[in-house]
Amino acid sequence: MFENLNTALTPKLQSSRSFPHLSRPTAPSAAAQGSVEPGGPGLWVGSSQHLKSLGKAVGAKVNDFLRRKEPSSLGSVGTTEVNKTAGAQLAGGADGDDGRSALQEAFPRLDPPPPATRKRTPRALKTTQDMLISSQPVLSSLEYGTELSSGQPQVSSSAQPSPADASQPEATTEVVDRDDALPNGEVSVSVPDLIHKDGQDDPKLKVTECRRASSPGLMERNGLKLSLSPISLAESPEDGSPPPRARTSSVDNEGPHPDLLSFE
């Protein structure tokens, strides 16, 4: 800001002050001009130095004037506000503390909320047993499994199932027998062996064979007899009945095909 003022004022001063120096050699006659011409360069050098010194002096005066000038007249550009009470507040720290305490008293603090003594439980969950939720899921699931396993044999023994449901109680008894007793008295849940499942499927196959023997099949209803053993082949000629034909893959040779969708 100050540099701009100096550059704006110095050319005007230089032009006004340089005219007397330039007009003096031109005022005398032509003879005087001839004597002045050899000393022209020296005059120009001296005038330039004088102008430089004059510009410095004017710039210093302008800077001093701007510094002494009141800040209110300059406006808001390039001015800084000075807080005159800052020193007093720093000097008297006790007064500031009193003011803060007064402000705190004017706006009292709210008491913190009371601590939660117990957690809120939803009303739908009355007990953990109803929703099968417990803090110790492993023990509770084992206990619940033992109760179910102990209850199933009683139900199967009390009510005799039909031949179609004969495989269900046997499967439950197998699960109970396969459960190994732990030292704590609990029963470990059996895991089906997928690798050696052929050996485990033997009793199930026996049950299915018994069911087939007890209930007449569709082939027998239609007049066809199934040969299950070589003994039946030996006994069939003695009865006088014609020997049964060997089963072939072609359906046309066997005659009318039984309707598998109709269960009489």
Swiss-Prot record:
It comes from the Eukaryota. InterPro entries: DUF4628. The modification Phosphoserine is found at S214, S215, S241, S250. Residues 1-47, 68-264 are annotated as: Disordered. Residues 149-171 have a biased composition (Low complexity). Residues 1-18, 73-83, 126-139 have a biased composition (Polar residues). The keyword Phosphoprotein applies. The keyword Phosphoprotein applies. Residues 194-212 have a biased composition (Basic and acidic residues). It holds the Pfam family DUF4628. Keywords: Phosphoprotein. This is Uncharacterized protein C1orf226 homolog. It comes from Bos taurus.
